[in-house]
Amino acid sequence: RLLSGGEKARLVLARMLYDPPNFLVLDEPTNHLDLVTKEMLIRALGGFDGTMLLVSHDRHFLAALTNRVLELVPGDPRVYAGGYTEYVAASGHEAPGMRSA
């Protein structure tokens, strides 16, 4: 007998509960958070023992949690060692609107 889609989903959830994953994918996790809640999230994720893939426009959040940056350039993805601050220093790229006069 083949499993239905719902049965497959339940099986995946059961497996995740039994053996928690050590990989998180977070897409704009600080959107709509106030400063206190954002800091709580940073502290909680700072203690996470695993890999995180973060997509965010929040430079403070990225600087607090990253230790490697993957820049997606068409045809030429680039990996930068170090966090967001080191990425800006090495690449010369800053967030739009943040350039000095």
Task: Identify what each model region corresponds to.
Residues 1-101:
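ABC ATP-binding cassette signature C-motif
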